[in-house]
């Protein structure tokens, strides 16, 4: 089998995504959806119907395993030479999406398609996530993604040789949200494995309201704080925080964050949040929680 498309999902109905992929799925390919212990019964029921579709398999975890473990399990189930990871909150924008990947496989090992966004913010309460994602997309044109292939690596939409993935895998120690893609990108870099970036984007539909997004950001920063210091020095926000600590300014940074946090949050929760203040909020919070 040439290709296995792997879709991990948690409380996300991905039936439309699967149907859109089936319309362009080659005969020597499969789609596997793994539900990571979703708590919403209606979503579990809808996703379970995927098992009845041709060339599709569906698996449901009894409990939430986390973003890394569920992806590793999907790779173990896969029968394809290539595995294509797609997040369940993705939307297909091209009828040639799969073909665009397959025509790039000769001599390649890892291929990243990229992330796209809605043309307009879906609602004011999602302004922070939308503004951040759109700016990130604009700052990562194909030319830059190819110039810095590892720094721009994302697990949202990428394809990799299965045998290679099984040698690296996602870090099972990461159970909560955040940085499994960072670690995987660093692992590829350390092994000097070439990463090809192409313009084959999926639309990211999973934009959370700002309060929920800030909770996710805090979770990802807690995840980062538990990583080895050698890893932290290779990631921008933690590297800056470690420098602040080295300069004996951690206490001051924490104090400054504590007194400014209410005003920062007020801005971030508004309809026109400042991404500069968002950066300062993340840095201040990390300074506060790091050891």
Question: Model-found features: residue ranges?
Answer:
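Non-catalytic, C-terminal membrane-associated alpha-helical segments of glycosyltransferases
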Residues: 219-222, 237-291
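A recurrent flexible, glycine/aromatic-enriched loop bordering the glycosyltransferase active site
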Residues: 140-160
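Short, well-formed alpha-helical segments that are part of the catalytic scaffolds
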Residues: 10-25
């Amino acid at each position: 089998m040439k290709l296995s498309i792997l879709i991990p999902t948690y409380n996300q109905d991905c039936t439309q995504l699967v149907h859109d992929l089936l319309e362009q799925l080659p005969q020597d390919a499969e789609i596997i959806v793994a539900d990571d212990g979703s708590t919403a019964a209606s979503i579990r029921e809808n996703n379970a119907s995927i098992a009845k579709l041709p060339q599709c398999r569906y698996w449901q975890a009894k409990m939430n395993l986390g973003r890394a473990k569920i992806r590793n399990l999907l790779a173990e189930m896969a029968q394809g030479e290539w595995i294509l990871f797609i997040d369940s909150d993705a939307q297909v924008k091209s009828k040639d999406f799969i073909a665009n990947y397959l025509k790039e496989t000769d001599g390649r090992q890892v291929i990243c398609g990229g992330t796209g966004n809605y043309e307009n913010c879906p609602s004011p309460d999602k302004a922070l996530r939308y503004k951040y994602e759109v700016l990130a997309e604009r700052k990562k044109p194909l030319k830059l993604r190819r110039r810095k292939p590892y720094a721009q690596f994302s697990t949202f939409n990428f394809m990799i040789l299965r045998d290679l993935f099984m040698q690296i895998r996602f870090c099972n120690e990461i159970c909560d949200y955040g940085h499994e893609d960072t670690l995987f990108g660093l692992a590829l870099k350390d092994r000097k494995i070439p990463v090809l970036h192409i313009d084959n984007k999926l639309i990211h539909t999973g934009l959370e309201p700002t309060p929920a997004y800030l909770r996710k950001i805090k979770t990802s920063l807690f995840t980062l704080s538990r990583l080895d210091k050698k890893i932290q020095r290779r990631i921008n926000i933690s590297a800056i925080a470690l420098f602040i600590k080295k300069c004996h300014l951690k206490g001051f940074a924490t104090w400054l964050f504590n007194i400014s946090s209410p005003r920062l949050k007020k801005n971030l929760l508004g309809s026109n949040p400042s991404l500069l203040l968002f950066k300062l909020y993340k840095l201040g919070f990390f300074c506060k929680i790091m050891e």
